[in-house]
Regions:
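Mixed-charge, polar/low-complexity N-terminal
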Residues: 5-7, 27, 36, 103-105, ...
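Extracellular S/T/G-rich loop segment that most often corresponds to the catalytic His/Ser-adjacent loop
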Residues: 7-88
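Conserved small/polar residues in nucleotide/adenosyl-binding loops
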Residues: 1-3
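Hydrolase catalytic cores
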Residues: 59-120, 129, 137
Length: 142
């Protein structure tokens, strides 16, 4: 599964071509300290109406070995880590050895946390904020 950040300089149509592929989990960036959307983040939808980004992930003031970093690369890295943990549970631990990228994308969308008062999906948050625990909880409800 590919994970692609959604950064581009045009604020109205800021998604690059790889983030439109059906197998890609496309993420925007938000500030987890106050749950605000990061203004520099990419946003969508696609030119043909695809709903992207799929999710928004933390990407502001992220602690790294080199200090605090901010940006869509941080959000993409955090999402990649969440997907890796999901693959560990799914494939390595044998809970769903045949999991495919579209199915996994669907689980993450179902587990997304949504803010009351906002309509989803939307151009900034997609289907909501990445939440791995809620993704696993969504699996229990399937």
């Amino acid at each position: 599964m590919c994970i692609r950040d959604s950064l581009n300089p045009d604020p109205d149509m800021t998604l690059t071509e790889p983030s439109m592929a059906p197998e890609v989990l496309s993420v925007s960036t938000y500030n987890a300290e106050n749950n605000s959307f990061y203004a520099e983040s990419g946003r969508g939808f696609g030119r043909t109406g695809q709903i992207r980004p799929d999710l928004s992930a933390p990407g502001v003031n992220i602690s790294t070995i080199d200090g605090c970093r901010t940006g869509s690369s941080m959000a993409a890295a955090i999402t990649a880590g969440a997907v890796a943990q999901f693959f560990q549970w799914s494939v390595i631990e044998g809970n769903n050895r045949l999991a495919e990228s579209r199915e996994i994308r669907s689980y993450f969308i179902r587990g997304a946390v949504r803010t009351q008062g906002l309509n989803y999906p939307n151009r900034e948050w997609g289907y909501g904020r990445l939440n791995l625990e809620e993704t696993f909880n969504a699996l229990l409800r399937v």
